[in-house]
């Protein structure tokens, strides 16, 4: 009997999400409005942060955040190469230069020491990445950023629901979360900027909507003058209420969704123990892991086949997988500009990373199916 294809990720959408979106569709106001405002309020309350601004994507959020910080031509921004390439793209599109640093071989996160070694006279910001639901050593990074007077913007795209030393990621400083379709909290496409910097938050809010001081809902629904003034040129990165309504329901479910992810991840760790798969290591500090991804490292010498062949073998058995990520400096555009850059840990992992299925609606027997498939693949190579 053939089994249905098991994707590496699938959003957990229930009747409450469908009803919430339907309510917005019937309300007569489907773009940025009251649901967007409620989402910002609820998200800030959950984290305990001062400001939350909803946007249409984490890429857009990073764009306007760096712009609001004054990043531009001649500046440098330090970021790990082993992350989604949108970070490097945004830095480059602002006219600045991404300065790539290597990551720890096992946690895939950059250290304060690596970041400080990369700081130069033109460094204006640091964009480190919480990886796969695990958390950065923020204290060290905050110390380095403060010592050099450099902005720190946490890429928390993987970390909604994660905690660092007992506090939610994003409760202090500035961070950006993603609500993309595969994330722990999804609204199809969306993001949240959070910060305790009032001036920065105000400018991000303005830049996300054409540089206007108010949005369309404020102007048309609250009786304010229909033509607001442009304070500065901005962009169109606002989040529609259709998306915000979906995110609000997901936010209420987040603890349960993440608890299920953790249970599945723990089952994987138990079931795959003893196999030469090298799952990611965990940092030494106290944390709550959000388990956005479950990542293996497939080394040809240890496993008898390389990562790409392993993924093809999973696919042949009806199981999806993903790569998170190919290091940014290995992409054609950046390789052309920094041909001599060597980041050994990022490069080693780029050739071996494989994300296997992990999402809340998986059944326990799905874990068993994946584990047996992996055992079968490895056994055939011995």
Curated annotation (Swiss-Prot):
What name goes with this protein?
UDP-4-amino-4-deoxy-L-arabinose--oxoglutarate aminotransferase
**Summary of the function given for this chain in its UniProt record:** Catalyzes the conversion of UDP-4-keto-arabinose (UDP-Ara4O) to UDP-4-amino-4-deoxy-L-arabinose (UDP-L-Ara4N). The modified arabinose is attached to lipid A and is required for resistance to polymyxin and cationic antimicrobial peptides.
Among NCBIfam families, the record links this protein to: PRK11658.1
Q: Any one cellular component term from GO for this entry? A: membrane
Question: Could you confirm whether the keyword Transferase appears in this record?
Answer: yes
Which lineage do the record's taxonomy fields give for this organism? Bacteria, Pseudomonadati, Pseudomonadota, Gammaproteobacteria, Pseudomonadales
- Its Enzyme Commission number(s) read 2.6.1.87
Keywords, sorted A to Z: Aminotransferase, Antibiotic resistance, Lipid A biosynthesis, Lipid biosynthesis, Lipid metabolism, Lipopolysaccharide biosynthesis, Pyridoxal phosphate, Transferase
According to UniProt, this protein's pathway is: Nucleotide-sugar biosynthesis; UDP-4-deoxy-4-formamido-beta-L-arabinose biosynthesis; UDP-4-deoxy-4-formamido-beta-L-arabinose from UDP-alpha-D-glucuronate: step 2/3; Bacterial outer membrane biogenesis; lipopolysaccharide biosynthesis
Cofactor(s) this protein requires: pyridoxal 5'-phosphate
Q: Which family does it belong to?
A: Belongs to the DegT/DnrJ/EryC1 family. ArnB subfamily.
One Pfam family name is: DegT_DnrJ_EryC1
Q: Which reaction does it catalyse?
A: UDP-4-amino-4-deoxy-beta-L-arabinose + 2-oxoglutarate = UDP-beta-L-threo-pentopyranos-4-ulose + L-glutamate
The organism named in the record is Pseudomonas aeruginosa (strain UCBPP-PA14)
Transmembrane region(s): none
Look up keyword DNA-binding and say if it applies.
no
Q: Subunit notes for this chain?
A: Homodimer.
GO process annotations (BP)? lipid A biosynthetic process; lipopolysaccharide biosynthetic process; response to antibiotic
Q: Name one GO molecular function term.
A: pyridoxal phosphate binding
The record ties this protein, via InterPro entries, to: ArnB_NH2Trfase, DegT/StrS_aminotransferase, PyrdxlP-dep_Trfase, PyrdxlP-dep_Trfase_major, PyrdxlP-dep_Trfase_small
